[in-house]
């Protein structure tokens, strides 16, 4: 709904992969940015093994559930599995495998949260990862192609977690 070229910067953090066409959404964001402005986008990164992640195996079911029912399911599941995953996710090397295959968010590496805060965060983020109608991770090449198509140049990747690209509108 915005006019073209009205903002000095446009950004999206973890949203575009939840649209019906993430690549198209990424290529249209630059339209609202003035020449010389910046566009920054963060999305889930798709790697060859991404779709083997436990969440993608159950999402075909969970994304069809009513939110209230899914939240109950998540609360029950997290209540049962949280104490176990608190241990499994901490095992050197194997912890990463468990975190990848068990569709429960991993907060074991968040030292500033106590047990209850981690539990609540796991419930919230597990619901968040299982509920969206769309979840389309992108490769670096796909996101960069979308930005270039939208008129963005000097695209570079930022070192933070996830796929974070930033560039300048020409």
Located regions from the model:
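A short SAM/SAH-binding and catalytic strip from SAM-dependent methyltransferases
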Residues: 8-22
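A short glycine-rich, Lys/Arg-flanked "PGG" loop and its adjoining helix->strand segment in the class I
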Residues: 23-38
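A short acidic, Gly/Pro-enriched loop at the edge of an enzyme's catalytic core
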Residues: 1-9
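Short, glycine-/aromatic-enriched active-site segment of Class I SAM-dependent methyltransferases
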Residues: 11, 44, 48-61, 115-133
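Substrate-binding clefts and catalytic carboxylate motifs of secreted carbohydrate-active enzymes
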Residues: 87-95
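Conserved class I S-adenosyl-L-methionine
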Residues: 38-85, 99, 103
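C-terminal lobe and adjacent flexible extensions of AdoMet/dcAdoMet transferase-like proteins
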Residues: 110-170
């Amino acid at each position: 709904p915005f006019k073209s070229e009205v903002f000095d910067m446009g950004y999206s953090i973890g949203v575009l992969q939840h649209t019906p066409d993430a690549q198209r959404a990424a290529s249209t964001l630059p339209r609202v940015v003035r020449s010389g402005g910046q566009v920054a986008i963060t999305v889930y990164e798709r790697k060859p093994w991404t779709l083997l992640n436990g969440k993608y195996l159950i999402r075909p079911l969970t994304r069809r559930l009513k939110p209230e029912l899914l939240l109950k399911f998540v609360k029950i599941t997290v209540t049962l599995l949280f104490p176990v995953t608190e241990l499994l996710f901490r095992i050197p090397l194997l912890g990463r495998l468990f975190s990848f295959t068990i569709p429960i968010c991993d907060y074991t590496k968040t030292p500033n949260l106590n047990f209850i805060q981690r539990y609540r965060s796991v419930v919230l983020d597990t619901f968040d990862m299982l509920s969206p109608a769309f979840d389309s991770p992108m490769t670096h090449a796909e996101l960069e192609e979308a930005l270039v198509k939208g008129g963005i140049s000097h695209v570079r990747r930022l070192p933070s977690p996830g796929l974070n690209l930033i560039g300048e509108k020409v």
